[in-house]
Amino acid sequence: YKIFVAEVASTSDEALLIHYLLDQSKDDKETAYLLNYFLEQFRTTLFRQTMFAEFEKIAHAKSEAGEPLTAEVLCNIYYDLNKKYFGDEIVVDKEIALEWSRIPHFYTPFYVYQYSTGFSAAIAISSKILNGEAGIVEKYKKFLSGGSSLDCIDLLKICDVDMTTKEPVEEALKVFENTL
């Protein structure tokens, strides 16, 4: 099976587990921890991995245009993206410009997007399950057993998640907002 399918499966199950643990929690500190953990998954997976993908896209475009990719150029791209993604309300330290150089994901070009898109698909599936959508558990099991039998996009359509639309990302952002 492909990494994307594995990411969707593991993240869907993790989201279901987090909701179960939140429902069972009787302790405010535990609840706060679980909520923080879940929200951090959105920040680090949906948001940050998208920023990584944009960094990659810009760097490759510059390379293909014949522009030299020096450490300074890459640091400037990365710093500017941090400013763009985090906005004016967050202080973005100059040192963040160097972070790109320690991210091993960039050794394999154009795969980080799978984390953010897989996360969106997983949140869409787990939301359907948590909301009691008719037939979704059976569809999810069929998705899980699909392995590599279909293209990832077609496998997700088994669960009525269409990654060719913005709907899964919008659902993930709605879950994030509701969790906040």
Report residues per predicted region.
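Zinc-dependent metallopeptidase catalytic helix centered on the HExxH motif
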Residues: 1-20, 28-43
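C-terminal, non-catalytic "cap/extension" segments appended to globular domains
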Residues: 4, 12-15, 23-29, 49, ...
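Solvent-exposed, amphipathic alpha-helical "stalk/arm" or coiled-coil-like segments used as scaffolds
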Residues: 36, 40-48, 52, 56
